[in-house]
Amino acid sequence: MDHSFDTIPGSSTAIRAGRSCPLHYHYGPAVFDTEPSEALRNLEVLYVVGGLYGNELALHEVLRLFDQEHGRKRLVFNGDFHWFDTDPATFERIQRAVLAHTALRGNVETELADPAPTDDAGCGCAYPEWVGDGVVERSNRILTRLRSATTAALRAELAALPMWQRADVGALRIGLVHGDAQSLAGWGFAQEHLSQASHREQVREWFSRANVDAFASTHTCLPVFQHLRCADPSSHRWVFNNGAAGMPNLAGDTAGLVTRFSTRPLAGGLSRAGVTHAGIFVDALAVEVDTAEAQRRFLAQWPSGSDAHASYFSRIVDGPSYRLDQVVRLEN
């Protein structure tokens, strides 16, 4: 889950809660070397919706866009669909709508579902060192407040969700994760890490063990479509991180983003960035909502002075300091 860049590059911290990655979050790349369930195979359209963050307006827009798609299709919420939705009625409405589709749990849902929460994991975000302590502490408190919106029945539904899935769109084999190929809260698909050649070598090794052509992820909250070359010059792999469906992703652009995979090109001009891989069209599909209403709803639950307001409101208004030309990255 995000941060709005109260960042301290190279800093160290004594805080563990919110920075640790619990052992039960781990699965490893080899789990993806399998066939998808019947519902996720032979797809013509796949939406991967990560980081909805309790934004009900964005949820309605995603469902509207998906309803316009044709053919064999599937919508997957890949975690952190809850976060700002501390109103119990809103929380339950979002959960009902999400669970009508395929869903994975993110760190938010996993921590909410814990029947005996402790302070060790905090928000479960496993924040790296470049995220400042203030963001970490506020996220831990947001999670604590969000838990008050849940019931035992709702938490049990979240606990039953898987941490990963496999999907095929056309012949494209996709690993669906919240974090990375190793862990539900891993930051291995963060744009900051993927900018480093040494880290991309690690990601190539994950691909070799996972036997997939692409990973679709979220968690780190900035969008990146990272291309990787393999030992075979004709072989290519991709990491598709949508950033956030329920918050702005780019400077001066208030749209959320979801990753759309399809055997057909996207019509309608809502692609912020796109590539074609193995005959499949992959787009960062814009989720545009009434920004004034979205801000009003956010402020009704998180007014000035609250933790989420301090961490997120400037991003909700102006977007992060991240440019469109940073999204698609090709290896030479």
Show which residues each predicted segment covers:
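N-terminal active-site segment of His-dependent metallophosphoesterases
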Residues: D2-A97
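Acidic, His/Gly-rich catalytic cores of divalent-metal-dependent hydrolytic chemistry
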Residues: D2-P29, T34, R41, L228-N332
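Residue-level marker for buried hydrophobic side chains located in beta-strands
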Residues: L46-V48, L75-F77, A103-L104, G175, ...
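Active-site metal-binding loops of divalent metal-dependent hydrolases
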Residues: G50-Y53, G79-H82, N107-E109, G179-A181, ...
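Short, basic, glycine/proline-bearing loop/turn elements
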Residues: R72-D80, R141, S183-A190
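Active-site neighborhood of divalent metal-dependent phosphoester bond hydrolases
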Residues: F84, P88-R166, A197-E205
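Short aromatic-enriched loop/helix-cap "lid" or pocket-rim segments at secondary-structure transitions
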Residues: D114-D119, G188-F189, D253, Q295-R297
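Acidic, His/Gly-enriched loop-helix segments that form or flank divalent-metal centers
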Residues: R145-I280, V289-T291
